[in-house]
């Protein structure tokens, strides 16, 4: 039996009550009070309650079990997802098993709350792409999870529906080029992409064909979305087309190299023979559709290239430029995973499609169709 913490003597003396007086109130002898204070006698429930009442405290203030030592965290070595920001000891990470190795992905930070995580980086910093992590749940092997790299905010809707089906989706925020590179390196199960080939006008398939051996990757449509110019609410700068981005009174926020939205902007600037040096803010980047739209909403930029859904989240204006497919590229050896099969089934569910379309700018009629 664990030793009981006993504060009876301390509290009695603090109240200025003699052992004899307390003994009378509790219905015991003075010797019993001394024995309890010495820890050689444990009172029954009735005596403990009378003692607490006499001293005007709770029973647990008098007698308590010592606090259990915290369970030690399990230490594991994990592969740091390439392209992650520099890690520091104690940084939260999410974990997923991909091709039998444990991959650590730092969740995207949100200023208002701690990110959902499975472990923290240990004091030993990453070396050769690997790092030690301290795992919270010793019983979790992180196998019933899918690690997906992509930039479509709508993937969070898919994650919510998958969670209801018992599958966890871990999202690593990357642009299209970065996502395909991670898939090629075997670091993720799925890469989300929207890269338009300028010569053919086709989306995603040409780039995937260049990067991967034939028949090694399946391509599934996630949705067709609208991309365009996101403006401040009410469009105070009267921006109507790409040409207006070269005006001196207009400032944009761009996307990073490799992003489909940046490629869309560049192709339009090239078509119109506009030098990017004449576009104010061209070299300032935001890592994502929602982040770019937030820059506009907060007044840090007059416009950006993003999706209609991103504009709608912040109540911003939107000028459509094109509709394009956002596809999911999956290594064929992963197609038979039960979790992947659940994901593909979810893409065809009407309740999921309705929710995604309600965000604005999404057409899900082709969702779940296999293109390759």
Residue ranges and their predicted role:
Residues 157-165, 243, 248, 261-281:
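Ligand-binding cleft/hinge of the Venus flytrap
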Residues 222, 231-252:
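Flexible hinge/capping segments at coil-to-helix
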Residues 194-208, 293-322:
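A ligand-binding cleft/hinge motif common to bilobed small-molecule-binding domains
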Residues 160, 177-191, 195-196, 285-300:
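Short helices/loops that flank or line small-molecule/ion binding pockets
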Residues 2, 9-13, 18-21, 29-34, ...:
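N-terminal hydrophobic or amphipathic helices and topogenic motifs
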Residues 141-151, 243-262:
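Short loop->beta-strand "edge-of-pocket" segments that line small-molecule binding or catalytic clefts
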Residues 214-226, 316-345, 364-372:
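Periplasmic-binding protein-like
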Residues 168-175, 276-288:
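Short beta-strand-to-loop elements that line the ligand-binding cleft
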């Amino acid at each position: 039996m664990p030793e009981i913490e006993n504060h009876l003597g301390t509290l009695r003396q603090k109240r200025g009550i003699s052992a004899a007086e307390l003994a009378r109130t509790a219905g015991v002898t003075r010797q019993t009070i001394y024995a309890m204070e010495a820890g050689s006698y444990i009172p029954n429930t009735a005596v403990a309650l009378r003692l607490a009442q006499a001293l005007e405290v709770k029973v647990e203030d008098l007698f308590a079990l010592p606090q259990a030592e915290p369970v030690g965290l399990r230490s594991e070595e994990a592969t740091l997802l390439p392209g992650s920001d520099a890690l520091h000891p104690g940084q939260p990470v999410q974990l997923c098993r991909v091709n039998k190795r444990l991959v650590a992905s730092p969740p995207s930070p949100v200023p208002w709350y701690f990110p959902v995580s499975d472990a923290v980086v240990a004091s030993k910093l990453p070396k050769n792409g690997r790092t030690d992590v301290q795992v919270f749940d010793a019983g979790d092997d992180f196998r019933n999870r899918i690690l997906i790299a992509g930039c479509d905010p709508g993937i969070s809707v898919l994650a919510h529906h998958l969670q209801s089906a018992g599958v966890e989706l871990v999202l690593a925020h990357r642009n299209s080029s970065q996502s395909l590179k991670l898939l090629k390196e075997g670091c993720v199960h799925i890469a989300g992409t929207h890269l338009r080939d300028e010569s053919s006008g086709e989306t995603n398939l040409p780039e995937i064909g260049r990067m991967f051996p034939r028949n090694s990757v399946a391509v599934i449509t996630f949705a067709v979305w609208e991309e365009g110019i996101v403006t401040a609410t009410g469009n105070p700068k009267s921006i109507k087309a790409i040409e207006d981005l070269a005006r001196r009174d207009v400032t944009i926020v761009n996307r990073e190299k490799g992003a489909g939205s940046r490629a869309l902007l560049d192709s339009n600037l090239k078509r119109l023979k506009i030098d990017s040096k004449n576009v104010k803010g061209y070299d300032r980047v935001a890592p994502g559709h929602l982040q770019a739209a937030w820059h506009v909403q907060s007044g840090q930029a007059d416009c950006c290239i993003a999706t209609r859904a991103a504009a709608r989240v912040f109540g911003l204006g939107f000028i459509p430029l094109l509709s394009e497919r956002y596809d999911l590229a999956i290594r064929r050896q992963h197609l038979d995973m039960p979790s992947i099969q659940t994901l593909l089934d979810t893409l065809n569910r009407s309740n999921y499609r309705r929710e995604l379309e309600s965000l604005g700018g999404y057409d899900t009629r082709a969702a779940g169709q296999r293109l390759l």
